Amino acid sequence: MKRLLVLIFGISFLVELNAQKAYSALPKYTAAQVREDALVLKKVLEANHPSLYWYTPKQQLDSAFEQMLNSIADSLNEIEYRNKIAPWVALIKCGHTTAQYSKQFIKQLPKYRYPRFPLQLKFWEDSAVVLSNGYLKDSFVQRGTIVYSINNKPVSYFRDSLFKQIATDGYAYNHQYQTLSSSFPDGFKQVFGVDSTYLIGYMNQAGKQDTISLGNFVPAPRDTNTNRPRPTERKTTLSKRQLRLLAIRSLSIDTITHSAYIRLTTFSKGNLKSFFRRSFKKIQKENIQHLILDLRENGGGRITNSIALTKYLKHSPFKIADSVVAISRKFKHGQYIQSSWLYWLAMNLGASKAADGLIHFKRFEQHYYQPKNRFAFKGNTYLVQGGYTFSAASMVVGALKGQKNIQVVGEESGGGQYGNSAMHIPYITLPNTKLRVRLPLYRMVIDQNRPKGRGIEPDIKIPPSSYAIRMGFDPKMAAIQALIKSKNN
């Protein structure tokens, strides 16, 4: 047993050492090259971004840029450079303006992923709770365990440091919490690197603070022993395409409670218009009285798909926004903007210059969409949202919130309720590092009478809890089921 432990430790050490060598072997860019890239980024954003100073004054953004530029004293690899650029980009407070790795590095990223921090953590407010532990047999730090420190630093230190890397719509910080909760080990490694061990401060089962030392997580190698019997594989009648579609959208019906559940994870793909038509036809046929629409994983997508869904649920005509405005159709520094000619063409065909000198997408400003008559749903509707509910998904919630039969359940949305910058979103590609930054071309004020700067607040707020995580149940769905039961009685 002792020899086995030594062998396992030795393998882990070698894997970690090789990963660190690979990390340090990443191509370096000179200080002059990365400064040039930063200056290119700034001038492209200043010339084309419609909402650059919507939340952050120019003086503050310029000052932060100078500090970032002055901090570049030596050559940097792509990870180090993104760690410099991303906080400045996030300071714009536009959730659609984000710094991303180059296409080439994205292809190589899997080989840099391990070893990494062993705990997946769920963050909210001042809490951090274990979702999973890479060491499955560890009986101390299990799912639902509260973590209060890492290497003698409070978890708030790591949370706040990584928050600086995550862009939001204004001050809709729940998006940062949700994003961090789904990617903490990767974010930790990206910004802080890896240690050989981590001293974890946690709350033990007796309710007292305790510590434990954990190593990095490295997945076990695949078992190549062909003589060992393989586990029985479950046979499925679903094709790969059907499984892909189920991951995007699904409908389930409970005829006992007269309720239907629609899970929708995107508005980008999945033949959604035909799915909506089939689903609401079936809902009507089964005489469903309660509809749960789960948008917690939905980061948005095509506005035309979100409009199609809203038509089945909205009781009155609606329009998309009070204003949808771009600075210009003439892309300055277009050589750095992905397919700028294609976006130029789209803006010339779909938008027009108004008296204020700006480019307006008048279809969304002026046209009122009519609700569906056929298969429209008039029963009790529960919209489930959270920090990932963003862009076109939060537009659906915003359009329906306040309607008599609608209740919004969950947490604050990640998408801004007042407006956002979106529509056409090409990439800026920096000339030396090839780092990419998303560039939304239109500023959309959805409703000028709504509060500016936050996401959509739920009608029924149900935050996460360590108890629910530990016990493995969904408190939001449990609350909705209780509401349905009370209305059926």
Where are these regions (language model features)?
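Flexible, low-complexity junctional segments that flank or bridge functional domains
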Residues: 20-291, 295-299, 303-325, 417, ...
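Solvent-exposed, well-ordered amphipathic alpha-helical segments
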Residues: 2, 12-15, 286, 290-292, ...
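Assembly/interface hotspot detector across virion components, adhesins/toxins, and nucleic-acid enzymes
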Residues: 3, 121, 367-369
